[in-house]
UniProtKB/Swiss-Prot annotation:
The keyword Translocase does not apply. It holds the Pfam family ATG8. It is a lipid-anchor. It is found in: Cytoplasmic vesicle, Autophagosome membrane; Vacuole membrane; Cytoplasm, Cytoskeleton. The gene is ATG8B. This is Autophagy-related protein 8b. A lipid is attached at G117 (Phosphatidylethanolamine amidated glycine). One of its GO terms (biological process) is protein transport.
Length: 122
């Protein structure tokens, strides 16, 4: 985990309170933290916290990440949840329910390489 990561920068109690407040106010949305993998050569993302519609697919969210980092179409990007590549067609709500952290946020990491050796799902 990076030194400037959201988890290291904010105590657990604060993160839990924030995610609880967000989920109560926006029940149809998923609180997501997106951070670049440590050694990746892709650009840094301009913001880490996202409030994503629950019915958005992983593939649609990857598109959002690509736009935020201004990555050209010729470059690949991989988004990981707990070091695995989630299925592109999976809904963010399903991935959130299965992989949310104890603090109530879903943590995702992006990279220009398939750094964790995960398999692809189409």
């Amino acid at each position: 985990m990076e030194k400037n990561s959201f988890k290291l920068s904010n105590p657990l109690e604060m993160r839990m309170a924030e995610s609880t407040r967000i989920r109560a106010k926006y029940p149809e949305r998923v609180p997501v933290i997106v951070e670049k993998a440590g050694q990746s050569d892709v650009p840094d993302i301009d913001k880490k916290k996202y409030l994503v519609p629950a019915d958005l697919t992983i593939g649609q969210f990857v598109y959002v990440v690509r736009k935020r980092i201004k990555l050209g179409a010729e470059k690949a990007i991989f988004v990981f949840v707990k070091n695995t590549l989630p299925p592109t067609a999976a809904l963010m709500s399903a991935i959130y329910e299965e992989h949310k952290d104890e603090d109530g946020f879903l943590y995702m990491t992006y990279s220009g390489e398939n750094t964790f050796g995960g398999s692809f799902y189409c």
